[in-house]
């Protein structure tokens, strides 16, 4: 489940701007595939950053995550089209800083409880045992 949609992108930029950023075939319409690729890339970044603290993908999508996903997607679309991202660079930097704070447990996501990653569960920890060494420094002293 994507954290943002094309409609979320259109809440932040005009349809004409989104067409300019996605329409490589000059069809005059939003290229949904290009928009979805940018959203998927943004969601992958978000998942990678918050996975040490939260189980991903998130089931309930907090507003902050939806905003970050849309902001990162718009920024990536600007880079995709080699267009100066302008103010979106600052918004991208702020979103990444927030996600970094979430990863460092300095910020939390509303309505979502932090869950330790599966590797932190010590109930399934492995234990290894071995026979005593046949040859050691003390046994081989004098040879």
Place the predicted regions along the sequence by residue.
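Ordered, amphipathic secondary-structure segments that act as subunit-interaction surfaces
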Residues: 48, 52, 64-84
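Conserved short "hinge" loops at termini or chain/domain junctions
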Residues: 1-65, 122-143
């Amino acid at each position: 489940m994507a954290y943002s949609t094309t409609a979320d992108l259109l809440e932040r930029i005009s349809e004409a701007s989104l067409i300019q950023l996605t329409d490589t075939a000059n069809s005059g319409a939003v290229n949904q595939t290009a928009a979805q690729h940018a959203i998927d890339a943004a969601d992958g970044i978000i998942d990678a950053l918050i996975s040490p603290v939260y189980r991903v993908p998130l089931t309930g999508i907090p507003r902050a995550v939806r905003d970050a996903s849309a902001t990162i997607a718009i920024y990536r679309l600007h880079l995709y089209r080699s267009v100066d991202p302008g103010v979106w660079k600052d918004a991208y930097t702020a979103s990444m800083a927030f996600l970094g704070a979430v990863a460092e447990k300095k910020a939390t996501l509303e309505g979502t409880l932090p869950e330790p990653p599966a590797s932190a569960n010590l109930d399934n920890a492995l234990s290894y045992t071995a026979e005593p060494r046949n040859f050691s420094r003390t046994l081989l002293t004098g040879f």
